[in-house]
């Protein structure tokens, strides 16, 4: 047999040869350094036979990214072995521990166990210690193939492994991997030796998991681990995890009293508290200003609609699994609104339209309802009731590019306003091999070309994604990277040829004939709830002045300064700034600490000197820390704060 190397050269090998045999044929140094391989683009290990004619690339420590799935998988086996040794030291025999599945996942692995006594989080460091000892033993990892009957004989007391084996085909060999006295059923691939595994790993947590994900099955104990090629990468990952916890919008939402989710109200139905409502209104006011300047007309539609409306639009029954069930009212059926677009189409259709009337831009902060599985709900970012900054533009073909550019400009402005500058675009176009799309070829080609031209004019990076278009038109997704390096899809601009056709809407053209308008869907925020959740984490609750629910805290040093503090608060309040006075009996330092805990951006401290000169001492939270200024004239500070609010800075 032969295999082909990356440079095109061919190696002649014995039948049944492995990637290790290929490495040895090239040279002893490579055989020593090799950790795994890819064969025809698929990850494999050094122990698995190669197919004749395979194109292979050997993996060494020089390309740790390629090696990561291998060492994470093998560390999962090392952990499983360590758990066995841990319970053996407690006096349990090998049959007392039963193992479920244990795959490698992004950044690490997990393994499910049925244990004789539960493992606690505080036990994980001891398991880690045993793992490091197993790595230090330098055990060879070997692979063997056996029959189904032989495989079943390996696990006479483990019903989970027996069930997995019973589900495998009778006529195919079953693979086992071993290291020392530990053996497990596994497809692989794995590292060649425990001694080559990195020490940069950590066991993170334990949780319960139903066997095979079925709640009718027993609950097993799942242990999660993470691993990276270097300690530096592990440290960076752990830091990011801690930072993510610090920024978690669910935690900050409670601490800053922004929102709550009450089980009596219902899962996935957030209640906006006064502070959160201020934040929400700042977002909506910002968007309303932009929409007014760009010629949008505001509309309001009901939260339910006749089921026939959604039948006509196609949202029912095609998306019924993500919608709440219809309700019977008299002789008609109604449904909680899953989308705003059908309602906006009916507003467009409420009177005759001429080519001179177009474009028609209809905008609404419309609340919609989707049925999300309870396990998928997450604070504000995954909910069942949410409000979209939804707008629909009805335009002529010759207006499409201009309208698309304007929406693109608006969305980029929104992201820049909130400090989200690491943005890339995804242009979703048709799959040339598919016939699922509605609309004619000429219109599709025009829309795709004009979207790409619009993106190029803006000058931001983009990728073209064939097959990513909806069946009713091409689209543009905005993907934003936050301060933690996580990517979020924020907002979509979608061209739609389907709804105008389904609702048979038209405009009278210059030629006196009826023509079909093109419809554009756009929502720069996506949803107010999700965008707010992302903003909370992006800013870690330290909102800029204009966005902060509580903008100014005035702190009198003593009770005799309370009247002056209240006078300043009233002036700021009349000017439109959200100001409060902390007239509690706490010491000044405690008042400052409380204001900082609540992430109030500006603190004004007033005492005898400030009162006499109508001044304030300013303590301001910034992205770089705390900035202090003493003896600031109050009127000058008020003007400065108003200017910052006006400029949304």
UniProtKB/Swiss-Prot annotation:
SMART domains according to UniProt: tRNA_SAD
SUPFAM superfamilies: Class II aaRS ABD-related, Class II aaRS and biotin synthetases, TGS-like, ThrRS/AlaRS common domain
Catalytic activity entry: tRNA(Thr) + L-threonine + ATP = L-threonyl-tRNA(Thr) + AMP + diphosphate + H(+)
Molecular functions (GO terms): ATP binding; metal ion binding; threonine-tRNA ligase activity; tRNA binding
Biological process terms in GO annotation: threonyl-tRNA aminoacylation
Highest rank taxon of the organism: Bacteria
One Pfam family matching this protein: tRNA_SAD
Keyword terms of this UniProt record: Aminoacyl-tRNA synthetase, ATP-binding, Cytoplasm, Ligase, Metal-binding, Nucleotide-binding, Protein biosynthesis, RNA-binding, tRNA-binding, Zinc
EC class (word): ligase
Quaternary structure annotation from Swiss-Prot or TrEMBL: Homodimer.
Protein's name in the database: Threonine--tRNA ligase
Species annotation: Deinococcus radiodurans (strain ATCC 13939 / DSM 20539 / JCM 16871 / CCUG 27074 / LMG 4051 / NBRC 15346 / NCIMB 9279 / VKM B-1422 / R1)
